[in-house]
Amino acid sequence: AVCVSLLGAANIPPHPLNLINFMEMIRYTIPCEKTWGEYTNYGCYCGAGGSGRPIDALDRCCYVHDNCYGDAANIRDCNPKTQSYSYKLTKRTIICYGAAGTCARVVCDCDRTAALCFGDSEYIEGHKNIDTARFCQ
């Protein structure tokens, strides 16, 4: 039975490593009663895509993160969504490693800044799963 379970798990596509890193950073900075998944499909920018003006401070964190990834994508051979990087969670902060200006460091700094911003911003339940066609134009 263990083999069957492992074989079944092998068919689940893995998340890109940096997404796992970003999720870990978010979990480290947000209130205990929240999960990182509650930050997807929040406002106009948290989750895939984005348009219009951010609706609050938390949504602005995602807007800034999207733009940061856009800037990182201009670095030669840099794909922010799949770039792995090294970091450390310590004493309520996040430390990114690597040479300044490299793809890995820039992407880590994007994720670090967003995660810390999430931790500092109010989560408004009514801004989860909003009608983006209506509120994000």
Curated annotation (Swiss-Prot):
PROSITE patterns in alphabetical order: PA2_ASP, PA2_HIS
Pro-piece positions: 10-17
Entry GO terms, CC: extracellular region
Origin: domain of life: Eukaryota
Catalytic activity field: a 1,2-diacyl-sn-glycero-3-phosphocholine + H2O = a 1-acyl-sn-glycero-3-phosphocholine + a fatty acid + H(+)
Cofactor note: Binds 1 Ca(2+) ion.
Principal location class: secreted
A Pfam family it matches: Phospholip_A2_1
Bridged cysteine pairs (disulfide): 44-136, 46-62, 61-117, 68-110, 78-103, 96-108
GO MF annotation: an example: toxin activity
Active site (record annotation): 65, 111
Signal sequence extent: 1-9
Localization per record: Secreted
GO biological process: arachidonate secretion; lipid catabolic process; phospholipid metabolic process
SUPFAM superfamilies for this protein: Phospholipase A2, PLA2
Record: residues binding Ca(2+): 45, 47, 49, 66
Key words, A-Z: Calcium, Disulfide bond, Hydrolase, Lipid degradation, Lipid metabolism, Metal-binding, Neurotoxin, Presynaptic neurotoxin, Secreted, Signal, Toxin
EC number: 3.1.1.4
Tissue distribution of the protein: Expressed by the venom gland.
Family: Belongs to the phospholipase A2 family. Group I subfamily. D49 sub-subfamily.
Role summary: Beta bungarotoxin is a presynaptic neurotoxin. The A chain has phospholipase activity. PLA2 catalyzes the calcium-dependent hydrolysis of the 2-acyl groups in 3-sn-phosphoglycerides.
Protein name: Acidic phospholipase A2 beta-bungarotoxin A3 chain
Organism the protein comes from: Bungarus candidus (Malayan krait)
